[in-house]
Structures are given as C-alpha cells and as structure tokens.
Amino acid sequence: MKTQVQGSYGLRVKSPGGIIKREAECKNVITDLGMNRLGNTYWKAAEYIRVGTGTTAADPGDQQLVNQIAATNNRLGLATTDNSGAPLYRSRVTFTWQFALGAVVGNIAEIGVGWAGTGATLLTRSRILDISGLPTTISVLAGAILG
C-alpha cells in the first residue's frame, strides 16, 4: 500500500484587536524523525509550533530549527474532516496555534511543528515563502500576535 503525507503552514500576524496585518502560506517538509514518529505515536507528533530565523532550505534530515526564537503549545483549535473514501482515502487535519502577545518579535524565516518545544523533535520544517515560492521573512512587531 502506498501512503503519502504532506502539509502546509499558514501564518498570520495580528494586532491585539485581531486585525490581520500579514499572511503567508508555504508547504513544509516532513522530516525523517517526523515520519518515524508518525509510525509510532502519530497522535502526539504535532504538539508545538516553533519559529526561528534560520535561512537554510528545509531538508528531510532536519531535526530542529536552525535558529529557534520561540515555541508554543497554545493550540486554539483542531478541525478534522472525515476520510474522503475510495479511491484516494484522503484525510485532513488542521491545527491552529497562537503565540502570546510579545512572545515573537522580529523577522521569522523558518517554522516547524514537533512533539516538544525544543531539541531534535521536529515533525516538519519549512522556510517562510513569498507568493512566488521564494524564501522571505515575515516581520512580527512588538504589540503584534503571531498565530
């Protein structure tokens, strides 16, 4: 049986009042560690979102962010859709996390999800990409919330 896993990130920078100031979306790389984790304890593979300033391309061999500056397990919601059925049997899971006000300030260049807030525990990693798919940063100013 052939099985595939893929994912993407959507980032929003919001004012404390909830006004969206910036959005970005990018596909991620499922790490080798992440694939092993999915095979053993998949329900605990995506507990934390982590952001950093690292600028190297994501690779399946990545185990942690290049230069992590913040992490949170403040999950606001979990939305799932049922299995799509034959012939593809697709399922979708959407997690929503939000950092506390002031927890992330600066230019974010990388993002990852893992089962812990630090260390070699990454399920996925990605660079932040612009609309053309090129590496960029997303600025989070003091007084803004990353979610």
What name fits each language-model region?
Residues 1-109, 115-147:
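Small cysteine-rich, disulfide-bonded extracellular modules of the LU/uPAR three-finger superfamily
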